């Protein structure tokens, strides 16, 4: 069994046989677990510090709990308690074992004596209790001597944690002018100590900084205003420091602090005031409408919506000439021009401007009035203005037959300035590119300069300029619209070419065409045209004209029996007259074709040439024509054939063509890939060769006639005629001013190294080609293909080298 008393008392109380005893020793500062059993009591009663009654009351006994204080700072292990078995005779045969939470790490046990110690610093805030198991074993056999029993070690709290503000620092806002006691914000501090044990976690609040403006409730932590009429304009920001102290605020308690930043929000408690009671401004008389004259500003100590302003002109002689608007960003009043100004008409204006708050709080009306006024004096400054036309626009009507130089309008302008300078008039030629008009430079008389034609231009829009004589930069302008009135100067005419068709079987009185006319003149009351046959066709026996009295006319036949063979086309002149003054007329021609038609009146053919030949040809004439055509064709073919079979120029055989080339070898055995042929004709006529042929890349050097003999093959020495000829040509080339400045001479002093062919001198060892076979040249590869063809394939005489 587990107990905390002496063995005799434990046996008498519990009536048990063999048992295991618990001994516990507590620190002297706490309740001592004496040799008598400890009754189970509440912790706040056991450690509250209140006087305990000396009367003994009967309670239930708890034997399986130990108590130890946290934060032990001694150097020796902290003694917790003692385990003892009644089977332990003190000879060390019993071994005590401790297991469970913290066994061997936090708590240790002396396996011989059963003493339990704490070897680590304990913190109740980290762990409030530990549950362990104890067992007594036979040291020699390891057999359990007692059943395993469980017990608890509780950590008793001490005041080792100060209150903390987990949400600090705090930010709060309260309106200015708030009444005393207005709640601002609530702060909360927490204490990690055991709230059920003593006053370690009992927190009270106090204010360390921020008085006399604010106060704090000691229990709830609510911060309130403590001073009335706090003005934001005087002081806007406050820093309040709040302290939270445990142990109920008693001396020795731990404390924590936090900062509360409080801002006074604005209310509309300040009326606007103009810093100036009089403003003076100036504006040019030429300032356009809506241009800015100046600004006024009413100062308001409030901010935001409470500082919004509204400016109005409440009085003065300039209310109709000027306007004022409020700038929403800067809350200033902007005075602008409302209508055009004139220095000559009025030189100054006076305005009375009011600035007011549109948002007023009723509880602060006693601080008003919330508007203010100021006086603005505006002076109009004179400028040199351009001439002004009266009227501002001209509309002129003129007939198109007006004579050149006729005055159609007097344009008038004047200088609005007091100096009244002289004016010169002109026309903006960009508005009158045809130069139909001109204006008198001094009088402003607008006159015609060219004949007018309404049918060409019925409207003219010109711009007349007026310039001051003393200041040509001052130019005024006015628009003049000129309408050209119509006169009857155009005769009516057909709008298009009329062509009518009449059938051969047409009857008399049949309608063959309806015609109309157009007139370019402008009709005032509607044009009316009259149609009739022209005088030269008044007695036309074939056709007649009937006026429809609606500006159209019908063309009718007078007879029947029209025949294409007799006359296929008729031309009918028609006279068209208008109703203008004077009467104008013109003659239009109607073309009428006679056509073959079907019985139902559909036109079949209007071309008489389709039915007969204009000239009868005999069969003999046709045969003669065909014969001439055949002869011409044969001649053409003969000429073409002769041109194609023209004798071709003589082409020199390829084998003989080798005599026309000089072959240059950079090394022996190079074959045709190392050759560069030169046209022999260029040697005979170097001027033409230079003009016609593209220049060739060559290796230039000064001509050395005297050294030529050392490079000439031996065969050349035998033929002295050829040698002399070459020297003569070389000298001629050197002396020719048109020849290239250098001749290309190559030196062949060494035979090529590594050539599969031996010396070429073997080619000259025989007296004739028949004495030696040159078939081996074909085995030397493509580089010697040309040489193999020269010596192996040719059957003619050997070339002369």
Curated annotation (Swiss-Prot):
Q: Among the entry's GO cellular component annotations, what is one? A: catenin complex
Pfam families linked to this entry: CADH_Y-type_LIR, Cadherin
Q: Which PROSITE patterns match?
A: CADHERIN_1 (PS00232), CADHERIN_2 (PS50268)
Q: Does the keyword Glycoprotein apply?
A: yes
Q: Which residues form the propeptide?
A: 35-59
- Check the UniProt entry and state the signal peptide residues, or none: 1-34
Q: Which Gene3D superfamilies match?
A: Cadherins, TCF3-CBD (Catenin binding domain)
Q: Which residues cross the membrane?
A: 620-640
Q: Which residues lie on this side of the membrane: Extracellular?
A: 60-619
Per the UniProt annotation, where are the glycans attached? 261, 420, 461, 542
- Bilayer topology: Single-pass type I membrane protein
Q: CDD domains of this UniProt entry?
A: Cadherin_repeat
UniProt GO molecular function: beta-catenin binding; cadherin binding; calcium ion binding
Q: What is known of its domains?
A: Three calcium ions are usually bound at the interface of each cadherin domain and rigidify the connections, imparting a strong curvature to the full-length ectodomain.
Q: What is this protein called?
A: Cadherin-20
Q: Can you name the source organism? A: Rattus norvegicus (Rat)
């Amino acid at each position: 069994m587990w107990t905390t008393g002496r063995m005799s008392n434990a046996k008498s109380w519990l009536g048990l046989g063999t048992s295991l005893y618990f001994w516990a020793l507590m620190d002297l500062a706490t309740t001592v677990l004496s040799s008598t059993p400890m009754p189970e009591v509440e912790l706040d009663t056991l450690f509250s510090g209140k006087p305990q009654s000396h009367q003994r009351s009967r309670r239930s006994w708890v034997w399986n709990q130990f108590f130890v204080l946290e934060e032990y700072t001694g150097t020796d292990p902290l003694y917790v308690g003692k385990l003892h078995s009644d089977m332990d005779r003190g000879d060390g045969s019993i071994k005590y074992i401790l297991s469970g939470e913290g066994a061997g790490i936090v708590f240790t046990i002396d396996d011989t004596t059963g003493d339990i110690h704490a070897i680590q610093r304990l913190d109740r805030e980290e762990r409030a209790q530990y549950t362990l198991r104890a067992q007594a074993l036979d040291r020699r056999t390891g057999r359990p001597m007692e059943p395993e029993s469980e017990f608890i070690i509780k950590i008793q709290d001490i005041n080792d944690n100060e209150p903390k503000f987990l949400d600090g620092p705090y930010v709060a806002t309260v309106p200015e002018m708030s009444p005393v006691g207005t709640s601002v914000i609530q702060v909360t501090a927490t204490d990690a100590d055991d709230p059920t044990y003593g006053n370690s976690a009992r927190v009270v609040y106090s204010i360390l900084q921020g008085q006399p403006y604010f106060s704090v409730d000691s229990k709830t932590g609510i911060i309130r205003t403590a001073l009335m009429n706090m003005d934001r304009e005087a002081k806007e920001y406050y820093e309040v420091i709040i302290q939270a102290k445990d142990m109920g605020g008693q001396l020795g308690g731990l404390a924590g602090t936090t900062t509360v930043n409080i801002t006074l929000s604005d209310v509309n408690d300040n009326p606007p005031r103009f810093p100036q009671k009089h403003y003076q401004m100036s504006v040019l008389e030429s300032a356009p409408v809506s241009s800015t004259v100046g600004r006024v500003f009413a100062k308001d100590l409030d901010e935001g919506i409470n500082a919004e302003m509204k400016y109005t002109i409440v009085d003065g002689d300039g209310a109709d000439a000027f306007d004022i608007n409020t700038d929403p960003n800067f809350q200033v009043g902007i005075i602008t021009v409302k209508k055009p100004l004139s220095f000559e008409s009025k030189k100054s204006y006076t305005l009375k401007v009011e600035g007011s708050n549109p948002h007023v709080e009723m509880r602060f009306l006693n601080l008003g009035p919330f508007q203010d006024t100021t006086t603005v004096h505006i002076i109009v400054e004179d400028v040199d203005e351009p001439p002004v036309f009266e009227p501002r626009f001209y509309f002129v009507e003129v007939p198109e037959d007006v004579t050149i130089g006729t005055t159609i309008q007097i344009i008038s302008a004047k200088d609005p300035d007091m100096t009244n300078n002289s004016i010169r008039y002109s026309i903006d030629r960009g508005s009158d590119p045809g130069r139909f008009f001109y204006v008198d430079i001094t009088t402003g008389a607008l006159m015609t300069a060219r004949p007018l034609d309404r049918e060409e231009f019925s409207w003219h829009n010109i711009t007349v300029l007026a310039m001051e004589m003393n200041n040509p930069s001052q130019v005024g302008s006015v628009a003049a619209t000129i309408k050209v009135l119509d006169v009857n100067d155009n005769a009516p005419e057909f709008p298009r070419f009329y062509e009518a068709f009449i059938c051969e079987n047409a009857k008399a009185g049949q309608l063959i065409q309806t015609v109309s006319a157009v007139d370019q003149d402008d009709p005032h009351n509607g044009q009316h045209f009259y149609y009739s046959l022209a005088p030269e066709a008044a007695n036309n026996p074939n056709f007649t004209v009937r006026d429809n009295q609606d500006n159209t006319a019908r063309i009718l036949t007078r007879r029947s029996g029209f025949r294409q063979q007799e006359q296929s086309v008729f031309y009918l002149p028609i006279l068209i007259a208008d109703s203008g003054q004077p009467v104008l007329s013109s003659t239009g021609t109607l073309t009428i074709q006679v056509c073959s038609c079907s019985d139902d009146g559909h036109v079949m053919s209007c071309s008489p040439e389709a039915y007969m030949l204009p000239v009868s040809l005999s069969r003999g004439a046709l045969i003669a024509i065909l014969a001439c055509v055949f002869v011409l064709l044969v001649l053409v073919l003969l000429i073409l054939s002769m041109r194609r079979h023209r004798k071709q120029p003589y082409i020199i055989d390829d084998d003989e063509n080798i005599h026309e080339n000089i072959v240059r070898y950079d090394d022996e055995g190079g074959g045709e890939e190392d050759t560069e042929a030169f046209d022999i004709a260029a040697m005979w006529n170097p001027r033409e060769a230079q003009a016609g042929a593209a220049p060739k890349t060559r290796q230039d050097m000064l001509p050395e006639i005297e050294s030529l003999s050392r490079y000439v093959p031996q065969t050349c020495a035998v033929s002295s005629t050829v040698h002399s000829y070459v020297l003569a040509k070389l000298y001629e080339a050197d002396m020719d001013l048109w020849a290239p400045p250098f001749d290309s001479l190559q030196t062949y002093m060494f035979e090529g190294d590594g050539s599969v062919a031996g010396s070429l001198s073997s080619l000259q060892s025989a007296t004739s080609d028949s004495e030696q076979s040159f078939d081996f040249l074909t085995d030397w590869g493509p580089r010697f293909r040309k040489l193999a063809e020269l010596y192996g394939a040719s059957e003619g005489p050997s070339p002369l080298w």
